[in-house]
Swiss-Prot record:
Taxonomic lineage: Bacteria, Pseudomonadati, Pseudomonadota, Gammaproteobacteria, Enterobacterales
UniProt-listed Pfam families: Glycos_transf_2
Name listed for the protein in its UniProt record: Undecaprenyl-phosphate 4-deoxy-4-formamido-L-arabinose transferase
One GO molecular-function entry: undecaprenyl-phosphate 4-deoxy-4-formamido-L-arabinose transferase activity
Organism: Escherichia coli (strain K12)
Membrane topology, Periplasmic segments: 257-269
Chain's gene name: arnC
Main location: membrane
GO terms, biological process: 4-amino-4-deoxy-alpha-L-arabinopyranosyl undecaprenyl phosphate biosynthetic process; lipid A biosynthetic process; lipopolysaccharide biosynthetic process; response to antibiotic
Pathway stated in the Swiss-Prot or TrEMBL entry: Glycolipid biosynthesis; 4-amino-4-deoxy-alpha-L-arabinose undecaprenyl phosphate biosynthesis; 4-amino-4-deoxy-alpha-L-arabinose undecaprenyl phosphate from UDP-4-deoxy-4-formamido-beta-L-arabinose and undecaprenyl phosphate: step 1/2; Bacterial outer membrane biogenesis; lipopolysaccharide biosynthesis
EC class: transferase
Transmembrane segments: 236-256, 270-290
Location of this chain's protein in the cell: Cell inner membrane
Length: 322
């Protein structure tokens, strides 16, 4: 029987990218939610290379009187999950909660996650109820969730929702993983002994626009396929075997037909030969592209470059920059 340790301090990690309109409300509501916990807390806001006034607003928030905000400024945009990992490396709490800055997932749900974690869960996930996203975003999210469930075997309902709670030992385990392509909810479930999901509200986006464009969603799909499993490589081998057997069968058939109907028929079968040839060429290019994705990720990981660079950290207890 494992001993369940009560949560003493909560760290809220929020990546920020061009969210100057939502920041004042985000800080106010998140602070209010954390105050209601009756526990120690800190709010880590990571500026992911914003081009608007977000970084300056974060610095001011950290330097305000009685502030609980830690501002982490990255030198450029590294992506949502890399920014969250940067926040993980600076947390001091024993329960870490991640939250998006767009306020579509209400900060008021934080106490519910803390209460569920106090029951002994390593990871507390969430499922968005009555999603207020476009049809395209909903469809893409369903496809990604199904892909993850098939490749990992983990029956979690909503991997795309970043409102989640992680015990400190789960975060420490994730920080020991150095691959560049990181999808935090999946990585956390690899190390979690006990995980659960709870339903949460989902609101319309009041400020700005979603940072996930069509191309970024496509890139996310590639990341998930190549960083989660080697199943596509096995499928590629199976496909190659099927094509090879099919090609050999067609070759035997063509020889038989030529012997049966004579060389005149063979001339009339030129277009079929071209069709078969182009099928093989297309399959080869698909295989080469897939192998290239894996090799490219191996090359990126072997170089061992840092996944982010922290330019500055501003803590409320000290006005000095780290």
């Amino acid at each position: 029987m494992f001993e369940i340790h009560p949560v003493k301090k909560v760290s809220v990690v929020i990546p920020v990218y061009n969210e100057q309109e939502s920041l004042p409300e985000l800080i106010r509501r998140t602070t209010t939610a954390c105050e209601s916990l009756g526990k120690e807390y800190e709010i880590l806001l990571i500026d992911d290379g914003s081009s608007d006034n977000s970084a300056h607003m974060l610095v001011e928030a950290s330097q305000a009187e009685n502030s609980h905000i830690v501002s982490i400024l990255l030198n450029r945009n590294y992506g949502q999950h890399s920014a969250i990992m940067a926040g993980f490396s600076h947390v001091t709490g024993d329960l870490i909660i991640t939250l998006d800055a767009d306020l579509q997932n209400p900060p008021e749900e934080i106490p519910r996650l803390v209460a569920k974690a106090d029951e002994g869960y390593d990871v507390v996930g969430t499922v968005r109820q009555n999603r207020q996203d476009s049809w395209f975003r909903k469809t893409a999210s369903k496809m990604i969730n199904r892909l993850i469930q098939r490749t990992t075997g983990k029956a979690m309902g909503d991997y795309g929702c970043m409102l989640r709670a992680y015990r400190r030992h789960i975060v420490d385990a994730m920080l020991h993983c150095h691959e560049r392509s990181t999808f935090i909810p999946i990585l956390a479930n690899i190390f979690a002994r006990r995980a659960i999901e709870i339903p949460v509200h989902h609101a319309e986006r009041e400020f700005g626009e979603s940072k996930y464009s069509f191309m970024r969603l496509i890139n996310l799909m590639y990341d998930l396929v190549t960083c989660l499993t080697t199943t596509p490589l096995r499928m590629l081998s199976l496909l190659g075997s099927i094509i090879a057997i099919g090609g050999f069968s067609i070759a035997v058939l063509l020889v038989i037909l030529r012997l049966t109907f004579g060389p005149q028929w063979a001339a009339e079968g030129v277009f079929m030969l071209f069709a078969v040839l182009f099928t093989f060429i297309g399959a080869q290019f698909i295989g080469m592209g897939l192998l290239g994705e894996y090799i490219g990720r191996i090359y990126t990981d072997v170089r061992a470059r840092p996944r982010y660079f922290v330019q500055q950290v501003i803590r409320p207890s000290s006005k000095e920059n780290e």
